[in-house]
């Protein structure tokens, strides 16, 4: 039993059902109980986010319900979903990067079957304003919508 499982028994146990990359991200955020440290972690993710192609920034790829401008594109490569994204706000860019790192390389079915419970497990809802927390959820739902389109054999937006 590791130290985290002693401190956060329910949260770490829940991570066992998450895809490995997403579970690692959740555990990183669980290590930081200080909201400022979580913000710093988000900003770090945002800085690591690869630039998004400008042609992907179209209405079909815009996440609705976000105060910031947020765009998500998805491609299906060898049966795995690969996302790209961007935001005009650094903190939200970190949320986008967190989700991209956690979900890239999964099958559409794996993404669709995920519940948003992992968002709460990160502890970020304590650190984020209600509108940003809602935006985080909306970004995740947009990514799932694109995965559903792949399941149905359709493209969703451009990319």
From Swiss-Prot:
Pfam families: SufE (PF02657)
InterPro entries (UniProt xref): Fe-S_metab-assoc_dom
Family: Belongs to the SufE family.
Protein name: Uncharacterized SufE-like protein slr1419
Organism: Synechocystis sp. (strain ATCC 27184 / PCC 6803 / Kazusa)
Taxonomic lineage of the native organism: Bacteria, Bacillati, Cyanobacteriota, Cyanophyceae, Synechococcales
């Amino acid at each position: 039993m590791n130290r985290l499982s002693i401190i956060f028994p329910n949260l770490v146990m829940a991570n066992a059902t998450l895809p490995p990359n997403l579970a690692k991200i959740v555990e990183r955020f669980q290590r930081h109980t200080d909201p400022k440290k979580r913000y710093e972690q988000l900003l770090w993710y945002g800085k690591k986010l690869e630039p998004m192609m400008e042609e992907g920034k179209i209405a079909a790829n815009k996440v609705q319900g976000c105060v910031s401008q947020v765009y998500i594109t998805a491609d299906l490569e060898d049966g795995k979903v690969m996302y790209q994204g961007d935001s005009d706000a650094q903190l939200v860019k970190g949320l986008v990067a967190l989700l991209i790192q956690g979900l890239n390389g999964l099958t559409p079915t794996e993404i669709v079957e995920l519940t948003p419970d992992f968002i709460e497990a990160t502890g970020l809802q304590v650190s984020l304003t209600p509108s940003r927390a809602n935006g985080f959820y909306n970004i995740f739902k947009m990514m799932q919508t694109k995965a559903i389109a792949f399941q149905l054999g359709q493209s969703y937006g451009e990319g």
